């Protein structure tokens, strides 16, 4: 879009920013013609298909970042890809390998961003998933740590209903987090129960008046 590119260039100039070069080109042609080495490539594929239809699979986005990734990796040590908030986490590891880091960012109870950090080094650390609640903190879980077969047994009565942050639910980390803090997880993406209120729960805490 030449108009948007021109507007961005003018805005950078008005702000006194001189270290940004605006290039209006297709991602495929730019990567092919780029002769340097970048510290990082940030890709935000357009998630609109024919007829302005929303798409979620990377193969349907523009550019097709999965097909373009080998060429990008030749030009940078690190690639960060922005995905749809609806994008499946397991699919990210299937497409980009088991050494990626997936950040799931929420704000005010809504999943806002899914960011996939793809390293180029073959000896990069094992992959991980990070749940980030804007303004509240983050939790990191290694991809290969394994999920506990179950958390603590269901033994009512409980004193508190714990509602995990949506980023934990999206990452399917509720049971692993429950095992970490010693509470009972009803499901992989649902709520938890605890006899005592955790000191710092990654979500919301409600007292239970009575359990039938």
Language-model features, listed with the residues they occupy:
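SAM-dependent transferase fold signal centered on methyltransferase-like domains
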Residues: 1-212
